[in-house]
């Protein structure tokens, strides 16, 4: 797959708030987690200087470390491994997220989606396209709320112009 095209297309789907490409780590042991996280940071950011912050979440509360410990210990590991890196908790260039569930997911990129409700979850509607800007904007806004839209345009000369028809097409 073309990674950028997938992100671009998903970024237009209503109901998606954020898209986060992740690295999946099946073995949740601390040694494996630090290795996978370090390799991920090296592959994305290399040896160039950067500031970072680590945020972690544990859905699996059986994990032996608490979220704050994971963040602090991983930050310490990354500082040792990347001498050009520094911590900035207020305005980091890189926000490294670690989510521990049955598996661990590591990511630093979060692409915003349009949000709203998934299309088709709130019924259907007809949209009358007039040739002006207000009708497609209204259609966009109602589609964002999960309504499936079918658009209709009535061409009724001499009351509607050929220009209005071309705008709709």
What are these regions, as identified by a protein language model?
Residues 1-126, 140-167:
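RNA-binding accessory domains that recognize and position tRNA/RNA substrates
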Residues 130:
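Phosphate/diphosphate-binding glycine-rich loops and adjacent basic-rich segments that engage nucleotide
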Residues 134-139:
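Short glycine/serine/threonine-rich phosphate/pyrophosphate-binding segments
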């Amino acid at each position: 797959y073309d990674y950028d095209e997938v992100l671009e297309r998903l970024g237009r789907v209503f109901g998606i708030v954020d898209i986060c490409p992740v690295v999946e780590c099946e073995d949740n042991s601390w040694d494996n987690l630090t290795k996978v996280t370090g390799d991920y940071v090296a592959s994305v950011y290399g040896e160039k200087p950067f500031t970072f912050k680590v945020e972690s979440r544990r859905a699996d509360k059986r994990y032996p470390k608490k979220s704050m410990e994971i963040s602090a210990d991983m930050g310490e590991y990354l500082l040792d491994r990347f001498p050009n890196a520094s911590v900035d908790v207020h305005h980091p260039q890189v926000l490294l997220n670690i989510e521990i569930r049955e598996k661990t997911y590591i990511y630093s990129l979060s692409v915003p989606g349009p949000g709203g409700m998934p299309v088709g979850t709130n019924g259907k509607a007809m949209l009358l396209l007039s040739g002006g800007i207000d009708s497609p904007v209204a259609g966009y806004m109602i589609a964002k709320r999960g309504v499936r839209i079918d658009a209709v345009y009535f061409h009724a000369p001499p009351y509607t112009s050929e220009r209005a028809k071309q705008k709709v097409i």
